[in-house]
Amino acid sequence: MPHSDEQGSLGAKELWRPSSREKTQIYDFMSKVGQKYDIPLKDYNALWQWSISEPAKFWEEIWHYTQIKAHRPYKQNLLYPANAPDENDVAIIGATEADREFISWKELRERVRQCANALKEAGLQTNDRVAGFVGNHANTVVAMLATTSIGAYWTGVSPDTGVHAVLERLKQIEPKILFADHASLYNGKVHGSHAKVREIVADLPFLEVLVVFETAKDVDFKFEGVRPANGKVVTYNDFQSAVQNESASLEFASLPPDHPVYILYSSGTTGAPKPIVHGSLGTLLQHKKEHLLHCDLRPGDRLFYFTTTTWMMWHWLVSGLASGATIVLYDGSPFRPFDVEGGNGEMAMPRLIEELQITHFGTSAKYLSVLEQAALNPSKHAHRPVSLSTLKAIFSTGSPLAPSTFEYVYASIHPDIMLGSITGGTDILSLFCSGCPILPVYKGEIQCRSLGMAVTAFDPAGNDISASGEPGDLVCTVPFPAQPVMFWPPGPKGLEKYRKSYFDVFGPNIWHHGDFVRVNPVTGGVVMLGRSDGVLKPSGVRFGSAEIYNVLLKHFADEIEDSLCVGRRREGIDSDETVVLFVKLSLASPLPCQSSRAGFSPSFAKSSVLVMFLASSILVLRSQ
């Protein structure tokens, strides 16, 4: 039920309080744990304290409650969840700006079987790598599940990523097979990918097979120039139809619990992005804990997160299958145009929620702030208003959700939902702090520190200051199963990268994440204050200054003598970080600012375009 008249500590204003705590899965879990161990668990904070003080018992109970099947690998738990829906129920809804696709559990399993057989006949083996230069559509999920069923590792990069950034990642892991979309539909326009794919394939000498998804109509995608030097190129349909044993059953490789399933990448702050390898059991256990307990996700619910395949939230979304939920994939602009209705497309996602009866909607803080600035009220829109009656929760991440946006959501989007501002990272492929269906929502606060995650705030000397309400570095003081299994490459080199990334600040037993936070000692909520390291996060897009510098060095070495890339966020003025690039132009070859900015387009992700570009013949650097 909505609340707006109560104040928590440190000025936290209560906006919502759950009305049916006893009906949630987390309440059921808390009751069962309390009875089994004969301990008084009266509220969430008591449960959280127990989960971090008794981690072995806690994770054992999570194992039993989530009903993960130990004899089944990660992908089998997704395709055959414990609370399995009817095989004819919808498992995946794939949506674009133009089309809808409804895939049953039975059809999904069959498509994975066909793709897995094709991959095996192409020579894919356990521990090989498969990459996807692909959008957020159903065939991407099928390819990932088929890949991991064999024991190979999956890595995804969105087609809007620049060629330079793609190669910085893929050249390190050397994929044997690459899936690629031949085009994408975005904001009403079809964008062909032939030029990008040609450049990518040309710089991957170890690639054996390029499989092309035909993702848009009437696109001229010629195979000339995209064939791997030592391999072949084939359409996805031909890739599957060429299988010799068409009736081969779907088999799942039996592998160790920490066998890799995903490779994601660090931001590239200190050089090339580091490949972060995540294991199957830790990922599955963590995601099911978050979905069942923190999101109250159930069979029959419809989970949607607006995400690209690069972002960690894609993997989090796909794991919703393991809870028996229907996952909704959307590939396109969140503000697709509505010519007959005018405006800037702000109603696109609310209408998608209404049309597809989405129960759990995830997005970025930036998206919600855009709706706030437009003063959008979906239920009072002049053209085809929507009630959003199926909506149970909204999740926001990528950057801190502004306090005013909290109030906007309850005033204009829906008065009685759980607004889960959440935070975690690519590094753990999950959440440190999350929503909670048995806790109130306070303005500007993430509801809680996640179960099993011993999150606290440290001052520079390594003292726990969370009880004081003072800001500090986000750290985790107890191990958790979703830690990466390794950094690529395997061996001492990757291990050293791993250690330096998280355990170099406060010692070998304290995970240092790089976020600056404040814990409310009364509500237990967490306030995100930004990054404490050099990572840039405009609009939630996480990348490092080194990626900018690498593009400058490659394309503008003669024109730009020196540069400095920084993030700016003015207290009380800016709700998001602005990326500013200062460049010192070479006197011998001055370059207009506009051409320098344009030069970033083909080499860097369009979602990471610089907001401010300042050029001068002088660049003064001072140490502080």
Where are these regions (language model features)?
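AMP-binding/adenylate-forming catalytic domain of the ANL superfamily
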Residues: 209-214, 606-624
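Conserved AMP-binding/adenylate-forming core of the ANL superfamily
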Residues: 45-50, 91-145, 162-167, 232-241, ...
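Structural core segment of the AMP-binding/adenylate-forming
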Residues: 149-238, 364-365
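Gly/Ser/Thr-rich phosphate-binding loop
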Residues: 299, 323-325, 359-362, 372-441, ...
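Conserved pre-ATP/AMP-binding loop-to-beta segment of ANL
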Residues: 88-90, 212, 227-265, 272, ...
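Conserved ATP/PPi-binding loop(s) of AMP-dependent carboxylate-activating enzymes
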Residues: 450, 463-504, 541-544
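Conserved AMP-binding/adenylation subdomain of ANL enzymes
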Residues: 282-302, 310-359, 370, 374-376
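AMP-binding/adenylate-forming catalytic core of the ANL superfamily
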Residues: 132, 157, 161-182, 197, ...
